[in-house]
């Protein structure tokens, strides 16, 4: 987009219009960047933004080759010349922290960016748990109501996957307030609690640049150059390059283009409309495989609906929709309003019905489901499908629904070749969402991701460091801080010691935080939900990321880690574990110190007794007379019992180096 479409050259244009409104869209909702003029100023710079304090800032855009562009802010200025491709980039020293300031950019046009603050800028990246909104978090309604922080700003980078580096991001800067943080396009709960904790101590403005896409593995955020040395992603990289050269859709997801072309349920009045007459639709039992619809083994896009009744008055509080596991993708609506969507994962669906969605009396829930496998569809048990109101009242959702196939994959509308690979192909989010915001000046990054890599946890030890190094090279600001949210508890607890990929992912995250310079792990093993991969307790993770930053970057003397295993001492009939980070001493939460297991030379694990002795834990078991190795909290959903006096939990660990169950697993 050109900013002079509504004003003459050399006049002053206001960069306050949301970028999305001016972008031409391809089928699938992807911006036609190649067809549209490039903007004079990149949309990552706008009204209400935060500049990074204490270091040179880059600002860029596009003009005619050879044009000079002058940037002024505070008492500083810089001049840039547009290159052969029209891109100009100026670097300038920011004014002191605070504001507000106005940035004036003068060339063939003049643009003013107003209400600009100077402080600390953080990238907040990952998958759906980083994107999880503040309004959905525990006490979300109250948190949103209290979110009046004019010194906190955020920018949601529009979700986009691409086969080639993108120039122009989608999004706009917003001030944190009750009217901006809730709902679609609102603030990440984890990022919000992180920024609020930081701002309380450092007293400077905080800018959050949110880069989050649900269900994606870490390799989507790394470049091909970073992934090639790992040798695990060669097939995906080759396919990416093949598509780049074959002239396929430049952006987005082949399957979404297929949706948009053939899904009659989304055209001319959505099938999600609660007023739609579905009496002619086929009755079917949910959970089930849609066999009543006669689609057989053919992949299909099916819409299903059912009615449910709610009391008057509705109880207060956030309602949740539980749908069990669904294969393969779904979009869920209540009374015509989208309440959730999941792509390319088969985890249990749990969505939130924000205030105003539900009503007393008749309600309609509608799902659009892309079923890929012959035995796909709804995979859960009947009692997993339910609506839980704010007071705990349960409305069953299993049983009779009505369904209609919008399109199946038989000719003349077969699925496109390779449809299954996006948006999980290597590098597509790095090119689609990170490339257009680099080299934005920043303090560091926070990262909440790993769920989609748990089955390859051992590979993650090499993958995530490669991605971190790639980001540091992309932004060109040295080894900036990179702080990680550890995986919370998930799934149901095992009553016996087990091998577990989630435990191995937590071990990988701990390994990375210690191995990669200027990184830190915020352990959240004391949070989580056995039935929901998207737990509502985001405050703990966000604030613990803040402790990481305060201690490791700002040099404040604050505890940031729970007890950390430092030394293993093998005694006759017992193992003694020595811990660092025992701030205020070791503390037991719960009835007793639990979740320890031991094994001898036979490598068979048994639950153990554990007791505190100063800053050590003594572990033993009558089933293992000569214990050699110890594990703590080694399962997907352990009971966290070991803490320090600062209230921070110990990270799950093991003393053995026996082969992990995820060793050798790759993306291929």
Put a short name on every predicted segment:
Residues 34, 38, 42-120, 375:
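Ser/Thr-rich low-complexity repeats and stalk/linker segments
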């Amino acid at each position: 987009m050109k900013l002079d479409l509504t004003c003459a050259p050399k006049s002053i244009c206001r960069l306050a219009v949301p970028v999305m409104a001016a972008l031409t869209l391809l089928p699938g909702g992807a911006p036609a960047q190649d067809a549209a003029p490039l903007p004079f100023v990149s949309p990552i710079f706008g009204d209400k933004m935060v500049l990074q304090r204490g270091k040179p800032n880059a600002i860029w855009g596009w003009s005619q080759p050879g044009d000079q562009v002058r940037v002024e802010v505070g008492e500083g200025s810089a001049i840039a010349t547009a290159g052969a491709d029209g891109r100009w980039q100026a670097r300038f020293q920011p004014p002191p922290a605070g504001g507000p300031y106005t940035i004036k950019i003068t060339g063939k046009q003049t643009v003013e960016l107003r209400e600009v603050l100077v402080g600390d800028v953080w990238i907040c990246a990952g998958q759906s748990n980083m994107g999880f909104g503040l309004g959905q978090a525990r006490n979300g309604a109250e948190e949103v109501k209290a979110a009046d922080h004019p010194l906190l700003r955020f920018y949601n980078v529009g979700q986009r996957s691409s086969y080639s580096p993108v120039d122009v991001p989608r999004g706009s800067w917003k001030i944190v307030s009750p009217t901006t943080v809730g709902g679609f396009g609102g603030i990440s709960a984890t990022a919000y609690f992180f920024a609020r904790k930081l701002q309380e101590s450092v007293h400077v403005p905080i800018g959050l640049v949110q880069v989050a896409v649900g269900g994606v593995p870490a390799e989507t955020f790394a470049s091909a150059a970073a992934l090639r040395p790992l040798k695990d992603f060669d097939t995906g990289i080759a396919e990416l390059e093949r598509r780049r050269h074959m002239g396929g859709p430049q952006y987005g997801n082949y399957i979404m283009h297929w949706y948009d072309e053939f899904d009659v349920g989304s055209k001319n009045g959505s099938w999600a409309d609660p007023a739609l007459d579905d009496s002619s639709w086929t009755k079917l039992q949910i959970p089930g495989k849609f066999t009543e619809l006669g689609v057989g083994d053919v992949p299909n896009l099916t819409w299903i609906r059912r009615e449910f009744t709610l009391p008057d008055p509705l109880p207060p509080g956030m309602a949740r929709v539980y749908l069990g596991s669904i294969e393969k993708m779904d979009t869920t609506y209540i009374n015509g309003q989208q309440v959730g969507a999941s792509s390319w994962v088969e985890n249990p669906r749990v969505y939130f019905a924000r205030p105003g969605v539900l009503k007393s009396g008749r309600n309609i829930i509608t799902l659009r489901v892309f079923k890929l496998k012959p035995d796909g569809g709804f995979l859960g048990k009947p009692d997993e499908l339910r609506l839980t109101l704010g007071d705990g009242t349960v409305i069953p959702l299993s049983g009779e629904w009505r369904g209609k196939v919008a399109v199946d994959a038989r000719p003349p509308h077969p699925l496109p070749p390779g449809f299954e690979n996006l948006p999980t192909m290597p590098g597509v989010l790095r090119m689609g969402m990170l490339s257009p915001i680099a080299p934005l000046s920043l303090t560091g990054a926070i990262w909440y991701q790993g769920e989609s890599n748990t089955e390859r946890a051992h590979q993650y030890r090499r993958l995530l460091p490669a991605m971190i190094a790639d980001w540091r090279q992309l932004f060109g600001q040295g080894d900036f801080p990179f702080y990680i949210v550890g995986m919370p508890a998930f799934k149901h607890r095992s009553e016996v010691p087990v091998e577990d990929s989630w435990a191995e992912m937590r071990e990988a995250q701990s390994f990375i935080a210690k191995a990669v310079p200027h990184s830190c792990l915020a352990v959240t093993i004391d949070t989580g939900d056995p039935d929901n991969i998207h737990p509502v307790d985001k405050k703990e993770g966000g604030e613990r990321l803040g402790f990481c930053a305060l201690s490791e970057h700002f040099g404040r003397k604050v505890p940031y880690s729970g007890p950390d295993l430092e030394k293993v001492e093998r005694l006759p009939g017992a193992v003694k574990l020595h811990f660092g980070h025992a701030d205020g001493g070791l503390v037991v939460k719960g009835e007793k110190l639990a979740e320890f297991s031991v094994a001898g030379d036979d490598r068979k694990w048994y639950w153990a007794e554990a007791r505190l002795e100063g800053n050590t834990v003594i572990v033993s078991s009558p089933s293992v007379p000569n214990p050699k190795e110890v594990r703590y909290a080694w399962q997907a959903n352990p009971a966290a019992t070991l803490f320090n006096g600062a209230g921070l939990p110990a990270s799950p660990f093991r003393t053995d180096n026996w082969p992990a169950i995820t060793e050798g697993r790759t993306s291929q």
